[in-house]
From Swiss-Prot:
Domain of life: Bacteria
Gene: ade
Keywords assigned: Hydrolase, Manganese
Originating species: Klebsiella pneumoniae subsp. pneumoniae (strain ATCC 700721 / MGH 78578)
GO biological process, one term: adenine catabolic process
InterPro entries with a match to the protein in the record: Adenine_deam (IPR006679), Adenine_deam_C (IPR026912), Amidohydro-rel (IPR006680), Metal-dep_hydrolase_composite (IPR011059), Metal_Hydrolase (IPR032466)
Keyword field contains Manganese: yes
PANTHER family: ADENINE DEAMINASE, N-ACETYLGLUCOSAMINE-6-PHOSPHATE DEACETYLASE
UniProt EC number: 3.5.4.2
Protein name: Adenine deaminase
Keyword field contains Hydrolase: yes
Length: 603
């Protein structure tokens, strides 16, 4: 008899009173996700399994009895879609944080690692998270790259790669299908990817930003079953009515009041509403929380606490096909959270497999890295750069006027056109404009750096550089001064990746991320401190204007699968037409000026 079968047999015996429980939790108020009730009950646990949920005081036979003193007992919280890499922590350090907050299971789309390392990146995700107390369900990334032909990442995934990964038992489905255009227009690659998911019988996650009407229906017809890219309350309702599981995410908090108000108009809240974090940086994760912070926001905006908790427990378990999770019921896994109040959720105690793992925000036992797993390093294949590499030039004209296409906006980008002066072939930056610069870092082609004008970010006072840039994670630098841009970029090349700020010839802040150019090997608290410092100091370089022009927008400046213009390692791209666009519209030569001032690009 297997060990699991033995535990189940012991649980049956304990439930019948034929043998004692291993652990008996008494004086609890059960948050019943099946009925919506809050009711007094005791919970008997055998091994990692709940054996019995029974009236208070009806059983006393247990090897250990622990009183919850009237605390609210909930199933462990679940995050149905997360890019764990956004925490910039390896899996064991990430687990140490979220477990103390009550998150006991996550569905991890490691497409950031996959875009750098290919299948080996997904293998690292599986191996590094296999024996964690956190239940980590890994997905097979479908977006490597997210937009073929418009960008080049470290690998290319199609049907064969998906079949390989979906054959691993630890891989639970197809990660968010971002190439909406390819799905809707029947690209061979996307048909292979989605069909591999359908053949596996596993989940197929969606990314349906902006889809509506016939296109939304077509996207579902292809086999996609969820979406976390909600843009409004109306969008959420349309997708719910269409049959998608909607995943309300915490990374767009400004949408939550309207989404909650819309949900409260419905006569029934179905099981097809879950919650996810998607992306949470380390300082926010440590100081405010992941799923727990999102649930508290939903409650603040008027959603009943039991409904919010159901989204993160029973609904999530149904979505993720984890029928051993999501309920406090006999036969389910004893991953449990104790709250003192449902008005503001704070995890008092966290149990994993029936063992007390965390109390009052503190982990009782450190989590060791997976044995025999070597984190991938040395992934920035770029030689040191010079200031001259960061100059925007116009071919075919020495002195004159050029009309250029450019990127407008920080998050939802639009096309713009502007006339600029050209001196010695170099564009003179207009007032209110900055530069965006991208260079391929995976060693798959030797293309020259791409550079374009950026409007809507103000006049950056220095430079911001990152090797964590959705979704191909090439090296990206924003700025106006070529010397500062080179300084920030070279800092990252030397450290193996990360983020850096430069101003007036000095590095203002730097967070090294030597693991795949996106993860740190620092303790979580120290990484959070460094990241917070970089975020705070970034306001010396950029004038932030929430909700769109924010620090987080740096990471999405090259996300070519979204509508509008974006700059990638292959050039200026258009998300609608799926074309690479020449930024030069027209130019004309004029007599050479007699006044040769220093050019505003800082070279």
């Amino acid at each position: 008899m297997s060990s699991n079968a033995q535990v189940r047999r012991r649980a049956v015996q304990a439930a019948r009173g034929e043998s004692p429980f291993d652990l008996l939790l008494i004086d609890a108020q059960i948050v019943d996700m099946a009925t919506g009730e809050i009711r007094p009950a005791d919970v008997g646990i055998v091994g990692e399994m709940i054996a019995s949920v029974h009236p208070r005081g009806s059983r006393e036979d247990a090897h250990e009895v622990r009183s919850l003193a009237g605390g609210y007992l909930s199933p462990g919280l679940m995050d149905t879609h997360v890019h764990l890499e956004s925490s910039h922590l390896p899996p064991e350090r990430y687990a140490e944080i979220v477990l103390t907050q009550g998150t006991t299971a996550v569905f991890w789309d490691p497409h950031e690692l996959a875009n750098v390392l290919g299948v080996a990146g997904v293998r690292y995700a599986v191996d590094a998270s296999r024996h964690l107390p956190l239940q980590v369900m890994v997905a097979a990334p479908s977006s490597v790259p997210s937009t073929p032909g418009l960008e080049m990442s470290g690998a290319d995934f199609a049907g064969a790669e998906m079949e390989t990964m979906l054959g691993w038992p630890e891989v639970r489905g197809v990660a968010e299908v971002m190439d909406m255009h390819g799905v809707l227009h029947g690209s061979e690659r996307m048909q292979e990817i989605v069909q591999a998911g359908l053949n596996s019988g596993k989940l197929i996650e969606g990314h349906a930003r902006g889809l509506s009407g016939a296109d939304l229906q077509a996207y579902l017809a292809a086999g996609v079953t969820s979406d976390h890219e909600l843009t409004s309350a109306d969008d959420a309702l349309e997708k719910l009515r269409a049959g998608l599981t909607i995943e309300i995410r915490g990374s767009h908090p400004y949408l939550l009041p309207d989404i909650v108000a819309a949900l409260k108009t419905l006569p029934h809240l179905s099981s097809q509403i879950t919650v996810c974090t998607d992306d949470v940086p380390p300082d926010i994760l440590l100081e405010k929380g992941g799923i727990i912070a999102l649930l508290n926001l939903l409650i603040e905006h008027g959603l009943p606490a039991v409904d919010a908790l159901r989204f993160a427990t029973l609904n999530a378990a149904i979505r993720l096909q984890r029928h051993d999770l999501g309920l406090i019921a006999a036969g389910r896994r004893a991953d449990l959270v104790v709250f003192d109040s449902l008005e503001k959720l704070v995890a008092r105690e966290v149990y994993i497999g029936g063992k007390l793992l965390a109390r009052a925000g503190n982990l009782l036992t450190p989590i060791a890295p997976a044995a025999g797993v070597t984190p991938p390093r040395d992934t920035l294949q770029i030689a040191p750069l010079r200031a001259d590499d960061f100059i925007l030039r116009v071919q075919g004209i020495r002195h004159g006027i050029a009309r250029l296409r450019h990127i407008r906006g920080a998050r939802f980008t639009q096309w713009g056109e502007v006339e600029v002066q050209v001196r010695d072939g170099i564009v003179q930056l207009p007032a209110g404009f900055s530069l965006i610069w991208v260079k391929h870092r995976h060693g798959r082609h030797q293309a020259t750096p791409q550079i374009a004008l950026l409007e809507g970010w103000g006049e950056l006072r220095g430079a911001i550089a990152t090797s964590y840039s959705h979704d191909s994670h090439n090296l990206v630098v924003l700025g106006r001064d070529a010397n500062d841009m080179a300084l920030a970029a070279n800092q990252l090349i030397a450290s193996g990746g990360g983020m850096a700020l430069a101003q007036q010839g000095e590095i203002l802040a730097h967070v090294a991320m030597p693991i795949a150019g996106m993860l740190s090997d620092l303790p979580a608290a120290e990484l959070a401190r460094q990241f917070r410092e970089l975020r705070d100091l970034s306001s010396q370089v950029a004038d932030w204007e929430p909700p769109y022009r924010v620090f987080k927008a740096i990471e999405g400046t090259c996300l070519a699968c979204n509508a509008g213009p974006h700059l990638t390692d292959l050039g200026l791209t258009d998300g609608g037409s799926r074309q690479i666009v020449d930024p030069l519209i027209a130019c004309r030569e004029i007599p050479e000026p007699t006044d040769h001032n220093n050019n505003p690009q800082g070279a």
